[in-house]
């Protein structure tokens, strides 16, 4: 996989949960000339308390530090339906109780401090099917958290499906963004999945998401906005899809060709 990414012209990637040992991962990434830049961490701060989350979070940070990463991606999974196969992702998202907002914010601040011990920035991922999905929820969380400890991962695909808009969240959170995912959306597949009341997994397997250049989002506007406001971090192109229908290497080339021709050519 690392060789495929390098062959397609990419400079880095995020670590997946199914990667081999940290030693083997680093060896293979280095051999391919790729940087490992981040990994996802599922937190249950509201359900279990921040102190219960810390041991696993430290283990993830240690892993990422070894790999030379600079970001740890976090998403609060209390009540999440993103991984539940028989629940519609479009109308069953969990909602925080009023008193839980501060619990989550304070817990994230604590984890952000820990991340800094390992040379990492904590970036929060707004995500479909979770307590922090919409623009308003994301901006409220950012307002409650310490900007020196908690930053944002901005994801175009989740913003589009969650709010029907990409630029609203980007404009509102630009000063907190330290990591970016560029993911495209096929509107017809999105509406088909909504009508069929599909889960998150079944929606993306049905083709709701795709790589930049293969869907409806015009990435020139968010890209130009990021550059204008001084963003110089990583932008990862991604799209959860059925690999038997959308071969990863083929779609990696589609994404890279689009980025080179449409964004880097500006």
Outline where the language-model segments fall.
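Conserved, mostly hydrophobic/aromatic
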Residues: 5, 13, 29, 64, ...
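Acidic/histidine-rich catalytic cores of soluble enzymes
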Residues: 13, 105-216
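Active-site acidic/histidine proton-transfer and metal-coordination neighborhood
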Residues: 50-152
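A short, acidic, flexible beta-alpha connecting loop/helix-capping segment that sits on the rim
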Residues: 236-247
